[in-house]
Amino acid sequence: MSRLLKYFVLSLGLVATSAFADNVRIGFVTTLTTPAGAMGRDMVDAANIALDHIGHKMGGKAVEFIVEDDGFKPEIGKQKTDKLVKQDDVHFVTGFIWSHVLLASRKSALDGGKFLISANAGPSPLAGKLCHKNFFSSSWQNDQNPMATGEVLNKKGVKKLYIMSPNYAAGKNMVAGVERTFKGEIVGKDMTKWGKDMQLDFSAELAKAKVSGADAIFVFYPGPAGPAFIKQYDQAGLRGKIPLYTVFTVDALSLGRLQKAKLGGVLGSWNTMFWAPDLDNPTNKRFVADFKAKTGRYPTHYAAQSYDAIMLIKSGVDAVNGDTSNQDGIRAAMLKADFPSVRGKYRYGSNHFPIQNFYLRTVKEDANGDWFVSHVSTVLSDHQDSYHGQCKL
């Protein structure tokens, strides 16, 4: 077997190629290895479903989809972005789970004259002083979901809050978000170690929360830290005593593991998000049904954002009939957000971050007994991030 053939076999469908030199080339940087790899695979699965839905064509041209693994490390993310820009000469770079990886990689894409579209990470600098005409988000700015949670806490009558979050860029944004809207007293706050040697033992922090007098606990623990925290929250006997509110901690990936472990403490917990798998619109219904049929699980928000990133790119390329050199035309079309989004209609602010609704969601069982996150109500309508005023576009 030739080296080239082996490469395509081993890629397991992560790279879709075209024989045409003038195709539309999209680079996708995400985490596929390490315990966080499940999140990246969710994103790639959704992007491939989006490509299936559009026949792998944009503006009449075939799409080449090139996936790179950042290994959960900013320096590798930058290297892979450099490769996509300089070697593969992609037209668009998207993906990016982690804020520190995106911040390390952004100049490689933008200085290289490419469109950069974050399908997850939303660090505050990119919404403010580091905004760029060729940067777009198909997700949210980091502060927004926790800002919605703060409003929920106020409506629920919470007066005293205990906060836990990893100590990195996104974690700091999440804490800033809930602190911006929560009107009560923060009785404790722990910023735990993140990265290669992330902290997964929260017994000391939970012991402090237990005696803090808190009415609720707010946490942000994405990836493998989420199930670890939920398990220990359950074991600490806090279920039914101190209600749990989360952002980016409880999703379809973690719920599958939690249900197998019979950790019922997560049932009835609350979180906020711009999207839910049971949002009632035709695009979302098709996306969720096809994702479940292909993977056997509910999609996460990571998947939803990745699906929308592909559709956003298509809206731009279609508008210029496949002429990827017409960046002004592509940019103008993408700014309209005129495509069928899984979240329903939204619009872009001057900093190219979505202005959109945020919803309260709860964890419950579906008709088949599977745990999932379900839409409850709208918390924030047409919400714009807090940093757009710093953007000079």
Question: Model regions: which residues?
Answer:
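Venus flytrap/periplasmic-binding-protein-like
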Residues: 70, 117, 124-127, 239-259, ...
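Extracellular/periplasmic periplasmic-binding protein-like sensory domains
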Residues: 233-307, 318-324, 363, 367, ...
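Bacterial N-terminal signal peptides
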Residues: 7-16
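Extracellular/periplasmic Venus flytrap/periplasmic-binding protein
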Residues: 79, 124-127, 132-236, 277-286
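Sec/Tat signal peptide C-region and signal peptidase I cleavage site
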Residues: 17-21
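Periplasmic-binding protein-like
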Residues: 84, 88-97, 117-119, 160-165, ...
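Beta-alpha junction/loop-to-helix N-cap segments that form part of ligand/metal-binding clefts
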Residues: 38-45, 53, 57-126, 138, ...
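Extracytoplasmic "Venus flytrap"
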Residues: 27-46, 68-75, 97-98, 164-172, ...
